[in-house]
Amino acid sequence: MSVRIAIIGDLNPSSASHQELEAARAVLGPDVETVWIGTTDPRIDRLAEMGIDGVWLAPGSPYADDAAVLRAIRWAREHGIPFLGTCGGLQYAVIEFSRTVLGWHATHAEVDGVGATNAVAPLACS
């Protein structure tokens, strides 16, 4: 039985994190298939049809299509699909949960500017 994992993010070959993700893909073995999906790629809205078993939202925010990223996170959460968000991926998961579950008008300081509705503050790592 193989597992199919979507790695969602805007691939940047000069990013150390993205280079390591690519290296990890090479050693996962035949039972794990990974599919890199850019945030502007229409496949981001067809994860169920693609038979995706897990979602890894890669570092690299802000993303080219924030709305598509939030839709993918919501799909994974609502369908019980394992989800891992690293760096910006986790930050966007906080935004998605705050908006759709808590009903907050949550924003991200690095995308929307510092304000009273920030669920994610400016971070030193960014």
Task: State what each model feature region is.
Residues 1-126:
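N-terminal beta1-alpha1 cap of cysteine-dependent amidohydrolase-like domains
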